[in-house]
A protein has these predicted regions:
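Short helices/loops that flank or line small-molecule/ion binding pockets
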Residues: 106-116, 130-133, 161-162, 262-271, ...
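Ligand-binding "clamshell"
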Residues: 128-140, 292-293, 307-325
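Short helix-loop capping/hinge motifs at secondary-structure junctions, enriched
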Residues: 86-89, 155-163
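A local structural motif
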Residues: 22, 89-100, 241-248, 266-280
Length: 361
């Protein structure tokens, strides 16, 4: 990446016209997931250089995958056909795939129930329990993702760790999943989703005998800890919420986001907090978060491949997704972090360093 290496240092070589060899430094369970991500797919340079829109033109979008582009109708659908030149074509059972551009959850549900849609990621959350109970062909698969609330680390009020702990512990995650979302979501006790798997097939999170996420970082995923939350709020100087400034929760327009905000408003109200809800259009919302012009906001993240680094690298100082402002602004020079990776075979050990000197490593 720095441009100081040599070709001999790179463990990648083409053995012949159809075989690529990659030498890994260590066993990497997610490697095949990684190279199947679209950024690693080979691209015909002569086609990609023909101008904007080549990837939507069947005559120019050349692929080497299981399917090729037959038709692209903007705002309607994309039609893929089986590639008879694919190396593993005998194990490709579908003659083609038609992908519909549908953003409305109700329209997607109607298409599914009419037999016009087989797979979708867009359904009204309140309909999923009914479909699971009544439709033997309906299958819901977990995503490598987490919906979460993010605190602006530079913002007044929530830059106090005790305030953040109080607000977090007051949330009844199970109630939000079961009564607000009702879409099969499970309570989270930590940022990295339980759908991440080890090479053994087991979850990377600690699970109980029933497959539920267990308590981590003081967070009980199955109920709120209101009494403990009140203790942290008092430690921050706001006993029973007295003197606590008004909190604004920012979210984007969309299915369920306002309902989650209203649930949080009620839960934080138990601590004596006054909470206002603010909704923004999607593009404006993204810009507001990125600029750090908020205190508390909703967010969600879905990983690109099966490894926690897909989540954890969001918080490095210069990440484009570091909306919580770790190591930015007034906190950039704060030498308050420590890290010790020597027990894991690394040389890194920092005491009282900046965020960049610790987490970024």
């Amino acid at each position: 990446f720095s441009g100081t290496g040599s070709r001999d240092d790179v463990g990648i070589k083409a053995l012949d016209e159809h075989t690529l060899q990659v030498e890994l430094i260590q066993p990497t369970a997610y490697f095949l997931n990684l190279v199947s991500f679209f950024t690693y797919m080979p691209c015909r340079e002569d086609m990609a250089s023909t101008g904007e829109g080549w990837e939507r033109d069947p005559a120019k979008c050349i692929t080497n995958g299981a399917f090729y582009l037959e038709e692209y109708k903007i705002g309607s659908h994309v039609l893929l056909k089986k590639n008879e030149n694919f190396w593993n074509k005998d194990n490709v059972k579908l003659a083609g795939i038609k992908g519909l551009f549908i953003t409305d959850a109700t329209t997607s549900l109607q298409g599914y129930e009419a037999g016009e849609i087989n797979v979708t990621s867009t359904l009204p959350g309140e309909e999923i329990p009914r479909l699971l109970a009544e439709d033997p062909n309906f299958v819901s698969e977990p995503a490598l993702g987490t919906t979460y609330i993010e605190f602006n680390m530079d913002a007044e009020i929530v830059n106090d760790v005790n305030v953040r702990k109080a607000l977090s512990l007051a949330i009844d995650r199970k109630l939000i999943c079961d009564q607000v979302l009702r879409n099969g979501a499970v309570p989270a006790a930590a940022f990295v989703a339980p759908a991440f798997k080890l090479s053994t097939g087991e979850s990377m999170r600690t699970m109980d005998e029933y497959g539920n996420v267990t308590t981590e970082f003081e967070i009980n995923p199955n109920s709120a800890e209101v009494d403990k939350a009140r203790e942290y709020l008092a430690a921050a100087g706001y006993p029973n919420g007295e003197g606590l400034p008004t909190i604004t929760y920012l979210y984007n327009e969309g299915t369920g986001h306002q309902q989650i905000g209203e649930a949080l408003q009620q839960m934080w109200g138990q601590l004596g907090a006054t909470v206002t809800l603010e909704s923004q259009e999607w593009a404006t919302f993204l810009n507001t978060r990125k600029a750090g012009d908020y205190s508390i906001a909703r967010n969600g993240w879905v990983a690109d491949y099966n490894d926690p680094i897909c989540f954890l690298d969001m918080w490095v100082t210069n990440s484009g997704n570091n909306d919580v402002q770790f190591g930015k602004g007034a906190a950039a020079d704060a030498k308050i972090y420590s890290i010790d990776l020597t027990p894991y075979g690394y040389d890194t050990k920092v005491e009282n360093g900046t965020w960049a000197e610790t987490y970024d490593v």
